[in-house]
Amino acid sequence: MQVNNLGFIASILFVLVPTVFLLILFIQTRQETEG
């Protein structure tokens, strides 16, 4: 089965971008509550 390279990259970005965004929000809120 041949995988479309552009679709593969798009799917990775579609998963990575929200994950990184949530991680940044999570870290910022943790730092605010700690200090």
From Swiss-Prot:
GO cellular component: photosystem II; plasma membrane-derived thylakoid membrane
Top-level taxon: Bacteria
Subcellular location, record wording: Cellular thylakoid membrane
Transmembrane segments: 7-27
Membrane topology annotation: Single-pass membrane protein
Cell division among keywords: no
Entry-linked SUPFAM superfamilies: Photosystem II reaction center protein M, PsbM (SSF161033)
Pfam families noted in UniProt: PsbM
Record carries keyword Membrane: yes
GO biological process, one term: photosynthesis, light reaction
Keyword terms of this UniProt record: Membrane, Photosynthesis, Photosystem II, Reaction center, Thylakoid, Transmembrane, Transmembrane helix
Family: Belongs to the PsbM family.
HAMAP family: PSII_PsbM
Subunit structure, as described in the record: PSII is composed of 1 copy each of membrane proteins PsbA, PsbB, PsbC, PsbD, PsbE, PsbF, PsbH, PsbI, PsbJ, PsbK, PsbL, PsbM, PsbT, PsbX, PsbY, PsbZ, Psb30/Ycf12, peripheral proteins PsbO, CyanoQ (PsbQ), PsbU, PsbV and a large number of cofactors. It forms dimeric complexes.
Described function: One of the components of the core complex of photosystem II (PSII). PSII is a light-driven water:plastoquinone oxidoreductase that uses light energy to abstract electrons from H(2)O, generating O(2) and a proton gradient subsequently used for ATP formation. It consists of a core antenna complex that captures photons, and an electron transfer chain that converts photonic excitation into a charge separation. This subunit is found at the monomer-monomer interface.
Protein name, per record: Photosystem II reaction center protein M
